[in-house]
Structures are given as structure tokens and as C-alpha cells.
Amino acid sequence: MASSVPGPIDLPESRYDLSTYWGRIRHCAEISDPTMLLTTEKDLAHAREIISAYRHGELKETTPEFWRAKKQLDSTVHPDTGKTVLLPFRMSSNVLSNLVVTVGMLTPGLGTAGTVFWQWANQSLNVAVNSANANKSHPMSTSQLLTNYAAAVTASCGVALGLNNLVPRLKNISPHSKLILGRLVPFAAVVSAGIVNVFLMRGNEIRKGISVFDSNGDEVGKSKKAAFMAVGETALSRVINATPTMVIPPLILVRLQRGVLKGKSLGVQTLANLGLISVTMFSALPFALGIFPQRQAIHLNKLEPELHGKKDKDGKPIEKVYFNRGI
């Protein structure tokens, strides 16, 4: 990210107003722009020069060239190390990397082996992306990483295989309804694994609390209630993020298979599935990613009693505090 370039002057977080949903949608669309995968080392070196000039007061205004430089660094470089993130695991590669495993998971008629393979592939990709973009100042131990990985794979495979076995046995449900429920099994598996993974990775925050800050950016204290809200919203965001690509294409494909795709070859149906997933990913993902703001505000009186009555550095009572939701 651009923040990896040192300098005394803070960078603007975004060119858009992140306090509004539309601003967050535009910001999410920008940081996941796949054209940033074409960024070269020469482009990055030039981008660093521009950002450095701004952070040292040599560049006074946020010009279009500044925003492009920031976009290139935000989508390509790790914020802590300043090193280039491996291409498949960058934010700008998010849609393309996930496209392969999503098409695999949503392929109709997968057997047990296929279901297990694609759920494993999806969780492996998630772990690789999280590891490549993780906070390097608080690295996760190998044992923690393996525990979370095993739990996520177990949850996703267990839910997928369990529901694949359960749905055909449901009574008083029409065959068409069973077909639809069967197509939504991958969604249930991915969501379950995502929720398990969030609470495993961030359980320590709930137990110890997270830092909350006043409007000046000064730490007020630590709050377990704020931590639960942050982790809970992150878990919910995993559900929301998965919904467009894991729900809309399967439902449309069921309809198409009863109409224009009826009797067509498996290859044609697979191409149609790929097209549906691609369009949904590129168009709907920013709307899902932008639902929750990264920086959350909450009234101080809704947190622990020991935080009530706190004052800022000017001696004024603090009404609202802010915290980072995390990912």
C-alpha cells in the first residue's frame, strides 16, 4: 500500500467519502481493479516517487497522477514490508483468483471427491491470500495458521458433504426445490468456513478487547464489546461478500437449464456458468464489500462502564469513540 512509503505527512485514505455507502463502493471497485495487475516494477518505482513527494510536502495537491500512484501501490504492495505481494494474492487479483475455485465449487453434479477438492482449494486460496496480506507486525504462528486452516477445511467440507447427503432425503419438498437447495450447498459451506475462520483468528480480540480512539486519534482504552462488534460484523461481511457470487449464478443457471440450455452439452453449460459467475463477481462484489465502513463509531456509554466519563486531551467529555473493524 501507499502507506509503506515513509514521510511526515499523512496520506488521504481515499479519494472518495468512505462515510457513505456509495463512496465505499467506488473505493472497493478501485482497489480491486484487475487492470492493476499490469503494473510493472518501473511503474511502482515512479509511484513511490510521487507518494514520497507528497509525504514530504513537495507535492502540495492530490493530482490525478497522485491518485493513480496511490492506487497502484495500494493494490500491489504490502503496507508493512513495502514489498510486492505475489500476483495471485493481490487485491487487484481477487476476482480472477477466486473465479477459478468458484466455478469449480458451483459446477453442478460434483461427487464427493470433487466437492472435497474444490472446498479444499477454496480454503487454501483464502489462507494464502490472508497470509500474503497479513499484518507483519503481529505475525501468526505456524501452529495457529495450521489450526485455522484445518478448522476452515473441516467446516467447509463437513457442511458440503453433510448437506449433499441431507438434501435428497428431505420430505415434503418438490424435486425442483431440492435441486435449488443442492445448488446452494457450496454457499452454505463457504459461509460456515468463513465464520469459523474469523472467530478462530480473532478470538483473542474478543477475550482481551480492542483499542478504541477519540476523534483526535488518541486511545481511550480497550473494549471487549467493541471487539465483539468488530468481529461479528467481519463474520457477517463474509456472508454478504459470498452471497452474490455463490447464490445468484446457481439460481440463474437452474432457470437456464430448464430453458435455453436444456439439452445442451456439458461444455456449453460450463461456459454459461463461467460467464454468469464472472459478470456477478465483477459487478456485484464492490457493492458487497462496501456495506460496512472500515472505521466504526459507537457512543461511549454503550461500552464498558470503566470507559464512561472519559475526557479528551482538551478536557472535554468524549461522546463517541472509533475503532477499526478489521478484515
UniProtKB/Swiss-Prot annotation:
The keyword GTP-binding does not apply. It is found in: Mitochondrion membrane. GO terms for biological process: cellular response to anoxia; mitochondrial transmembrane transport; one-carbon metabolic process; serine import into mitochondrion. It is a multi-pass membrane protein. Pfam families: SFXNs. The chain crosses the membrane at residues 98-118, 143-163, 179-199, 272-292. The modification N-acetylalanine is found at A2. Mitochondrial amino-acid transporter that mediates transport of serine into mitochondria. This is Sideroflexin FSF1. The lineage of its organism: Eukaryota, Fungi, Dikarya, Ascomycota, Saccharomycotina.
